Amino acid sequence: MAKKALIVKAQRKPKFAVRAYTRCNRCGRPHSVYRKFGLCRLCLREMAHRGELPGVTKSSW
């Protein structure tokens, strides 16, 4: 889990637009965040397996 201070810091608008970065809305993780869902890869995988994300299915080929 991310520290509260880092989550609050990420929510503020930065002085320069290029300094903005995405964080997972669920756990606050800063890396590998899918913009479409606003979740990191770990939370996305967990929620997809539990069926909490509509329209997301496990692919097999």
UniProtKB/Swiss-Prot annotation:
Zn(2+) binds at residues 24, 27, 40, 43. One of its GO terms (cellular component) is cytoplasm. GO terms for molecular function: rRNA binding; structural constituent of ribosome; zinc ion binding. Binds 1 zinc ion per subunit. The keyword Magnesium does not apply. GO terms for biological process: translation. The keyword Transcription regulation does not apply. PROSITE patterns: RIBOSOMAL_S14. PANTHER family: 30S RIBOSOMAL PROTEIN S14 (PTHR19836), SMALL RIBOSOMAL SUBUNIT PROTEIN US14M (PTHR19836:SF19). Belongs to the universal ribosomal protein uS14 family. Zinc-binding uS14 subfamily. Binds 16S rRNA, required for the assembly of 30S particles and may also be responsible for determining the conformation of the 16S rRNA at the A site. This is Small ribosomal subunit protein uS14. It comes from Acidothermus cellulolyticus (strain ATCC 43068 / DSM 8971 / 11B). The lineage of its organism: Bacteria, Bacillati, Actinomycetota, Actinomycetes, Acidothermales. The gene is rpsZ.
